[in-house]
Design a protein with these regions (language model features):
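C-terminal output helix
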Residues: 117-127
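Active-site residues of response regulator receiver
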Residues: 62-63
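Acidic, metal-coordinating helix/loop segments flanking the phosphotransfer/catalytic sites
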Residues: 35-59
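Short amphipathic alpha-helix used as the core "switch/output" element in two-component signaling
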Residues: 72-85
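Acidic catalytic/metal-coordinating carboxylates
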Residues: 38, 70-73
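Conserved acidic segment of CheY-like receiver
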Residues: 5-16, 20-24
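Alpha4 helix (beta4-alpha4-beta5 surface) of REC/receiver domains from two-component response regulators
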Residues: 22, 73, 96-113
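Hydrophobic/aromatic residues positioned on beta-strands within the core alpha/beta folds
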Residues: 92-93
Length: 145
């Protein structure tokens, strides 16, 4: 039996958390989601990943605009944690300046998903991208228990 994929989710909007969970269900993905509502919580979790039994995610989904920081702050910390080097990191946001995107990519973001305004597009885009990233990660050794 395959173990559930683990997703590190930094998202302050509970409505978006629900939509992401629904997108994963629609893709028939069995996922364990570790949710962090602020950049500060996510940074602390990223520092702990792989240490003292703290789980290493298969994928990191990061809202860019968060209370107490942003996605780049989380990416910077994740980049310093060797256990997170091979983990795909996806920025999910409704708005991002070009220089912010460039900075996020330099810090290790794999790609950007723009949050659409309508529900069905979000379901399709987020679900498909997460499925793609998780499948790609299976072969790269990023998955760990």
């Amino acid at each position: 039996m395959l173990s559930k994929m683990r997703i590190f989710l930094a998202e302050d909007n509970l409505g978006d958390v629900f939509l992401i969970e629904e997108a994963l269900r629609r893709q028939s993905l069995e996922c364990e989601i570790d949710h962090y509502a602020t950049a500060e919580e996510a940074i602390q979790a990223a520092e702990r990943c792989g240490n003292a039994g703290a789980p290493v995610p298969d994928l990191m989904l990061l809202d860019y605009n968060l209370p107490r920081g942003n996605g780049s702050d989380i990416l910077a910390v994740a980049g310093r944690n060797p256990k997170l080097k091979a983990v795909p990191k996806v920025i999910v946001t409704s708005f991002l300046q070009a220089d912010e995107l460039d900075h996020a990519l330099q810090l290790g973001a794999s790609c950007l998903i723009t949050k659409p305004v309508d529900f069905e597009t979000l379901m399709r885009d987020v679900g498909a991208k997460v499925a793609e990233m998780l499948q790609a990660g299976k072969g790269s050794g990023a998955t760990s228990s």
